[in-house]
Regions:
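A solvent-exposed interaction/effector surface
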Residues: 1-173
Length: 173
């Protein structure tokens, strides 16, 4: 886990970045979510590629809203930030929370989700979706929707030497 030192009124305080990711916890698992709570936001994309400054600001704002209302899971390994692209020009972000967050777009997800962990570049997502489709076929399942959770921010992915992502396939309501 990376520790970033942050200056605060002349003192140095450690600030945790991304928690260490354990692929075995998420790989080839089935999750049954019954109104799992999230806050939702969206960012513009250009053919599924988000604009980094806008994305960073949006994620920071979502995290701050959840933290300020004490509705972010205290176990950072349990926090999910899911991405779904309803079009090539828009990405929706879903941050898991423990309760409703004031002044945020609160939503929930329900259904059966099958997850699989991949390690590779962002541009490999279409290939990973094809691999996930093959995996689901072996189980006589078909994805209705896909959500992607990136285990590390770009800085931590570089430090850890892995760009893990969890593909969540919604297979039933």
């Amino acid at each position: 886990m990376e520790t970033i030192v942050k200056e605060s009124k002349g003192k140095q305080e450690p600030k945790e970045c991304c928690p260490l990711f354990h692929p075995e916890k998420w790989d080839k698992k089935t999750f049954n979510w019954d109104h799992k709570k999230f806050i939702k936001a969206s960012v513009p994309t250009l053919f599924h590629m988000p604009f980094p400054p806008l994305l960073g600001k949006k994620i920071t704002k979502m995290m701050k809203m959840a933290e300020d209302s004490n509705n972010l899971d205290s176990d950072k390994e349990e926090i999910l930030l899911l991405f779904a692209d309803p079009s090539p020009f828009k990405s929706e972000l879903y941050l898991s929370v423990t309760a409703k967050v004031p002044n945020a777009e609160n939503t929930d997800l329900s259904g059966t989700f099958i997850s699989k962990v991949f390690d590779g570049a962002y541009k490999a997502i279409p290939k990973f979706i094809n691999q996930m489709d093959d995996y689901l076929k072996q189980q006589n399942k078909k994805a209705n929707n896909y959500y992607v959770h990136y285990a590390y921010c770009p800085k931590c992915a570089k430090k850890e030497g892995h760009n893990y992502m969890v593909l969540f396939a919604e297979v039933g309501k």
